[in-house]
């Protein structure tokens, strides 16, 4: 196989990897905040539910979760697995998994805020929602940015788990090409692409963190 053809196939895989990454990030970041609110709820039923959800998502392998979402409808209800469901399965699997991790990151940031800030905001006449949105949340985001960056970099590498659903992302393309060509060149190129992707994510997140430094 010509090198240009191999490279084009790996680029196609990279596009799929990027799609998984960005869709997961866009969905799991806000969902994680909602899960965080549920985890910190004063209602014991709500709090227990989200605590259990987080425990399951963090305590079982992401690969297993993807397979449950993908094959679950077939084994439980006898439903036919379609390409549309395959797309929905990885979206649900990745988003729900990472939402649990982001929820705990947010919770740690919120609980680290001094109680005196809430009291000062109350004295100034701020409502609870105003206090959170205008005073607490900006500081929390700044504090948790390093942890979010670490999770984002982990997500870049975790996208390779989509191969379990036969999705032709970067790793799966490299695996197929390496088997066809019986050499390690596709793996080496894929490793380089993953590394550059991680560097770009780290750079973007670092710039975002610097822009928020005025919250200190």
Please state what every model-predicted region is:
Residues 1-216:
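Transmembrane alpha-helices and adjacent helix-loop boundaries
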């Amino acid at each position: 196989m010509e090198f240009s053809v191999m490279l084009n196939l790996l680029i196609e895989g990279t596009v799929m990897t990027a799609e998984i990454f960005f869709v997961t990030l866009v969905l799991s970041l806000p969902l994680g905040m909602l899960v965080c609110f549920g985890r910190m709820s004063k209602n014991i039923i709500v709090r227990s539910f989200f605590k259990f959800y987080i425990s399951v998502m963090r305590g079982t392998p992401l690969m297993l979760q993807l397979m449950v979402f993908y094959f679950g409808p077939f084994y439980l209800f006898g439903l036919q697995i379609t390409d549309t469901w395959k797309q929905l399965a990885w979206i649900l699997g990745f988003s729900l998994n990472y939402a649990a991790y982001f929820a705990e990151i947010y919770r740690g940031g919120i609980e680290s805020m001094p109680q005196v800030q809430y009291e000062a905001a109350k004295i100034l006449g701020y409502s609870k929602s105003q206090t959170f949105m205008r005073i607490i949340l900006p500081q929390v985001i700044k504090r948790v940015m390093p942890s979010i960056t670490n999770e984002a970099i982990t997500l870049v590498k975790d996208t390779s788990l989509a191969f379990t659903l036969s999705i032709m992302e970067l790793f799966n393309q490299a695996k197929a090409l390496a088997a066809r060509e019986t050499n390690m060149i596709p793996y080496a190129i894929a490793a380089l692409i993953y590394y550059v992707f991680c560097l770009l994510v780290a750079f973007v997140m670092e710039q975002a963190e610097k822009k928020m430094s005025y919250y200190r």
